[in-house]
């Protein structure tokens, strides 16, 4: 006997965040431009994914589909089985350029987000959330400064604290440390891992830095070049957590994974512009 099942046409149950044959084509004056094509990936809840690939390969295009700022032209992107159709507080984006409100203090930038996204919390609970997140990123002392009174690293700390204070299910990071000096960058990578361990959002992060990806991610997704870019290879990163940078870098598997990534990017999918 054949059982009659409810229709599942609108839902997909593979992975928490699921890319199913995703394509995105942009109309241009010279005709349609196929940016990405046939992207398939299943991300588990709480997983940390880094996406690397050459400039213009479609990394931001992919992230915009997850944030809901744009829609795929073929296939679908699903969160918890539901197609992503618009932006929402369950998915927060942190950009390279901080995007803080310039006239508000660090504290108020975070407080406003908490107020808007978690209105069910009492005023004192909201205050506690803000205090906690300022502390997590080491900005308790500097909380009353405005963005123009903060360093680049401090601004990015505020942006990360603001995103996480909303308790998003998915944290989307678009090259968040790209503009920072090497030391600040390493500090923030470590802070990000500490915060991620606490809240465990699913993370999707674009980076151009192979070492950053190997230190942070559970899996590194490497994209081929466009047009019609797709996922070329996925590296599983085996290092135990919590991670210590020295232990990771000294692990013999680190050099091997690094060589694989370099080989992918600079030999198999070399790009003239890089
Ligand atoms: N709105 C648009 N209209 C036309 N083409 C677009 C549009 N947005 C992106 N593209 C093209 O799609 C391709 C992918 O762009 P995308 O910004 O996703 O790349 P990226 O990998 O994030 O690049 P980068 O590392 O330089 O930020 C590029 O060739 C880009 O020119």
From Swiss-Prot:
Null allele outcome, as annotated, is: Mutant requires high concentration of nitrate for growth. It grows normally with nitrite or ammonium as the nitrogen source.
Keywords, comma-separated and alphabetical:
ATP-binding, Cell inner membrane, Cell membrane, Ion transport, Membrane, Nitrate assimilation, Nucleotide-binding, Translocase, Transport
Membrane topology label: Peripheral membrane protein
Signal peptide per UniProt = none
Task: Please name the Gene3D superfamilies in this protein's record.
Answer: P-loop containing nucleotide triphosphate hydrolases
Q: Name one GO molecular function term.
A: ABC-type nitrate transporter activity
Which enzyme class, named as a word?
translocase
Q: Does the keyword Signal apply?
A: no
Known catalytic reactions: nitrate(out) + ATP + H2O = nitrate(in) + ADP + phosphate + H(+)
Q: Where, by residue number, does the polypeptide cross the bilayer?
A: none
Record-level GO cellular component terms: plasma membrane
What EC identifiers does the entry list?
A: 7.3.2.4
Where in or outside the cell?
Cell inner membrane
Q: Where does ATP bind?
A: 53-60
Among the GO biological process terms of this entry, one is:
nitrate assimilation
Where is this protein primarily located? membrane
Query: What is known about what this protein does?
Result: Part of the ABC transporter complex NrtABCD involved in nitrate uptake. The complex is probably also involved in nitrite transport. Probably responsible for energy coupling to the transport system.
Q: Which family does it belong to?
A: Belongs to the ABC transporter superfamily. Nitrate/nitrite/cyanate uptake transporter (NitT) (TC 3.A.1.16) family.
- Assembly and partners? The complex is composed of two ATP-binding proteins (NrtC and NrtD), two transmembrane proteins (NrtB) and a solute-binding protein (NrtA).
Q: What is this protein called?
A: Nitrate import ATP-binding protein NrtD
Lineage, top ranks: Bacteria, Bacillati, Cyanobacteriota, Cyanophyceae, Synechococcales
């Amino acid at each position: 006997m054949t059982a009659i099942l409810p229709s599942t046409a609108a839902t997909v149950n593979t992975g928490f965040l699921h890319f199913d044959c995703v394509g995105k084509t942009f109309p241009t004056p010279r005709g349609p431009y196929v940016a990405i094509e046939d992207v398939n990936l299943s991300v588990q809840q709480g997983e940390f994914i880094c996406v690397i690939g050459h400039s213009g390969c479609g990394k931001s295009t992919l992230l915009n589909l997850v944030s809901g700022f744009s829609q795929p032209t073929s296939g679908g992107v699903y969160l918890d089985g539901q197609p992503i159709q618009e932006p929402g507080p369950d998915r927060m984006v942190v950009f390279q350029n901080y995007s803080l409100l310039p006239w508000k203090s660090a504290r108020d930038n975070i407080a406003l987000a908490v107020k808007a996204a978690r209105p069910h919390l009492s005023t004192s609970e909201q205050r506690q959330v803000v205090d906690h997140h300022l502390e997590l990123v080491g900005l308790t002392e500097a909380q009353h400064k405005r963005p123009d009174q903060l360093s680049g690293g401090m601004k990015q700390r505020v942006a990360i604290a603001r995103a996480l204070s909303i308790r998003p299910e998915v944290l989307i990071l678009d090259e968040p440390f790209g503009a920072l000096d090497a030391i600040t960058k390493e500090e923030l990578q470590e802070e990000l891992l500490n915060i991620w361990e606490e809240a465990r959002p699913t993370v999707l992060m674009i980076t151009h830095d192979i070492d950053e990806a190997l230190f942070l991610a559970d899996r590194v997704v490497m994209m081929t070049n466009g047009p019609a870019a797709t996922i070329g290879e996925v590296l599983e990163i085996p290092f135990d957590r919590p991670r210590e940078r020295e232990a990771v870098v000294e692990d013999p598997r680190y050099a091997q994974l690094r060589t694989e990534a370099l080989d992918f990017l600079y030999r198999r999918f070399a790009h003239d512009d890089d």
